[in-house]
From Swiss-Prot:
TM ranges: none
Record's subcellular location: Cytoplasm; Nucleus envelope
Tagged with keyword Cytoplasm: yes
Top-rank taxon, per record: Eukaryota
Entry GO terms, CC: cytosol; nuclear envelope; nucleus
InterPro entries (UniProt xref): Hikeshi-like_C, Hikeshi-like_N, OPI10
Keyword Phosphoprotein: no
Descriptive protein name: Protein OPI10 homolog
Keywords: Cytoplasm, Nucleus
Chief place where the protein resides: cytoplasm
Family to which this protein belongs: Belongs to the OPI10 family.
Organism: Schizosaccharomyces pombe (strain 972 / ATCC 24843)
Amino acid sequence: MFGAICAGRLVQTNLQQVADNQFVFQLDSAESLNHIVVFLLPNSPFPVGMGAKVYFQWPGKPFQFLGYLTNEKPSAIFRLKNTIQTLSENENCVGITAMLGISVEPLTNFTETPAVSTSASNVIAKPLPPVTSVAQKILTNLYNFLASFATSQLPPNSIGLGDLRPNDTFIPLRVFQDWHAKFLNKLSNNPNFLDSEDQI
């Protein structure tokens, strides 16, 4: 009924049913996980009025609510990178096996679950960044890309518009078109790529 993919790994095939409406995936070497995708398998929709809550658990810790799936939202990406802060500093953080829990419940139960279930897990459900922050990241990405193609020489057979000064810089329109295509491709492959964007 469910599938899961940890970023950089193969599809998880170790789903176990632990109760009539509860399932778990065992996640080996969980300390290296950043993101996980959870999804409904094709041709296995929820019964009408049902959905699934998704949880994450470190060994010896309570389950932490990540989000949910429904027939209208059959897949979701969850950020796990900073959940390791819930472990004690004295615990060995290498080779840890964590659990991904899925609980099938009536949709009416979904309004009762907070975005984050414990104070120790305050970094799981990441809020959307402000529009100005996203715009700044996009413009920085664009500037860095265009600057790498800037030239002080007007390309051959080009006609300058307006007054040209000796220190003017030129960027071919093709470069902007290339950036736009590459940006959209990156965005479709990873909607969160701007969060760690240090590259062109």
